[in-house]
Amino acid sequence: VHSHASESYTMPPGQEYVPSGTFRTADRSCNMVRVGDELAAELSSYGISVVHDRTLHDGESYNDAYENSLASIQSYLAKYPSIVYVLDLHRDAVQDANGTQYKLVTAEDPAAAQVSLIMGVAHDGWQDNLRLAIAVQEKLESQSPTLMRPITLLNYRYNQFAAPGSLLVEVGAAGNSLDEALRAARLFAKGFAETILGR
């Protein structure tokens, strides 16, 4: 799912999108939905069944985004009770005092956006999600040593109470390009897939 589906990236000249806010767009080919498409395709290549919800949960109201995405999550869990993992893809926003957006990239060439796992701890069972996050983080650090930023624990729920195996995944920041985010999604998918498949 994408609670903040309209979050987007810095686009190169000639590839601009129609903004719906600061570093936001309803254009699914340029926002988090596109990153989710990439992640879903890569996970599917490992034989993992994926339900990718392409809804713009923040389209009508940014403040209601988590409530809207929770309704989608609960609907999918009822429809597909075999769902084991729920990933909520976002992008970060890191800027200096002047508002200049930072670009979070790996040391590898070509560069990929860095990824961070955000864990909500204001609900029962958060430790199960954290165990998954640690396992995924360790796998990815062994595969792509500069891909992952530190895991962040915050006193929120982020809908992670809805299902065990829930992760909030931030793919890059507003200063990154979409191409860097797509590379990161592929790298993350590889590590996530190999973690849950026990490889």
What are these language model-derived features?
Residues S45-S49, Y80-Y85, Q114, T146-L147, ...:
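Loop/turn elements at helix/coil->beta-strand transitions in domains of secreted/extracellular proteins
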Residues V1-S82, A93-Q95, R186, L197:
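N-terminal catalytic or cofactor-binding beta/alpha core of small enzyme domains
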Residues S3, I73-M119:
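Active-site microenvironments of hydrolase-like enzyme catalytic domains
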Residues V50-H52, Y85-D88, S116-I118, P150, ...:
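Structural recognition of the beta-strand scaffold that forms the well-ordered cores
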Residues R149-R199:
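Active-site-adjacent mobile loop/cap segments within catalytic or ligand-binding domains
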Residues E38, E42, Y46, A135-Q143, ...:
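Generic non-transmembrane alpha-helical segments
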Residues A5-S8, L56-E60, R91-D96, A122-G125, ...:
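Solvent-exposed loop/turn segments at secondary-structure junctions
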Residues G125-T152:
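Active-site-adjacent substrate-binding region
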